[in-house]
Swiss-Prot record:
Protein name: Ras-related protein Rab-40A
Coiled-coil residue windows: none
Disulfide links within the chain: none
Any Pfam family: Ras
Biological function: RAB40A small GTPase acts as substrate-recognition component of the ECS(RAB40A) E3 ubiquitin ligase complex which mediates the ubiquitination and subsequent proteasomal degradation of target proteins. The Rab40 subfamily belongs to the Rab family that are key regulators of intracellular membrane trafficking, from the formation of transport vesicles to their fusion with membranes.
Encoding gene (name): RAB40A
Upper taxonomic lineage: Eukaryota, Metazoa, Chordata, Craniata, Vertebrata
Source organism of the structure: Homo sapiens (Human)
MF terms in GO: GTP binding; GTPase activity
Region (Switch-I): 41-49
Amino acid sequence: MSAPGSPDQAYDFLLKFLLVGDRDVGKSEILESLQDGAAESPYSHLGGIDYKTTTILLDGQRVKLKLWDTSGQGRFCTIFRSYSRGAQGVILVYDIANRWSFEGMDRWIKKIEEHAPGVPKILVGNRLHLAFKRQVPREQAQAYAERLGVTFFEVSPLCNFNIIESFTELARIVLLRHRMNWLGRPSKVLSLQDLCCRTIVSCTPVHLVDKLPLPSTLRSHLKSFSMAKGLNARMMRGLSYSLTTSSTHKSSLCKVEIVCPPQSPPKNCTRNSCKIS
């Protein structure tokens, strides 16, 4: 894990994830479903390696992900030994329509623990759009994930379902484990203007920025800064603020309890663009 080296970088944190699983379970499909980022591997001269970058927004911080897929090659051990250096997370992928790919998870986990012990992992059941051909019951996969102590997702690159959500959850686990979430120390050198904006939006909700006695251009910048950077500390402390006016016409901020958003996507998510039977 690393932070950007200059304020001009387009991300706040950089994480390296490995996609691991048998061949033909759809790992390349997952990478191809990502529209942003580079697709050409810096090590394209090595066969059997797929590579993609993408940037996600996590608690207001921009997290750039480097995603590596070894494509289940027989020389996985040699490749993984090289690519596991500096890896912060592993995505275990199986095909829900291929029983053999699920039963091979123990073999992959053993190799991961041999070369990268203790690296955070999530279990991903791919090709949910083929649920009518399902060979791995969701309940069985969920029980297996609970036994491993990892988070479980079923995803569909075709429907763009749970792809970003699964990456975001693994990034959250990694950042919290290393205590590098946005409540920690600043991840880059800020300009004076950004420091001023950080101070203001840290105690002012975005919907109250319009009420501040500031020029309209500055208020607009503050709102954009607040939404893009996610610097409103109330989201992590479980607090919100409301503007109250006393009888002396002086405004003040008072704290109001709010419910923090769940760390995993809801089960009734309808973001997918196709019907899953």
